[in-house]
């Protein structure tokens, strides 16, 4: 069955020239972190784990100022404000440019395929060192769909 397609001319969008970007100040970034920490206290979260990839990075970026490009990443935020970034090879350099102070853990499995995997450890081992044993409530922000074959990789 053939369908007739009608094209319509519409007005070009308005172009705003000489508009300068708004840069987020350190004060703004710290205020964001404080808002999250206050909400954690209100909701009684001891820790939050933020998942990010190129398509799902806004929550992570809200605090760190960047989205892990090409890869995945995690941000673990403790109720005392301490933060840890878990990043693959391509993003290791971004920790020093993050807008919040954070420790860095290299997790090669978050790297692109065929990258060096030296020092690889299980994510569950990383969490054993990071997650507070006395924590009563740990939240997860973001998501990743795992297939049944990949479920065996997760021991959280």
Each language-model region and where it sits:
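A composition/biophysics-driven feature that prefers long, compositionally simple stretches
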Residues: 1-155
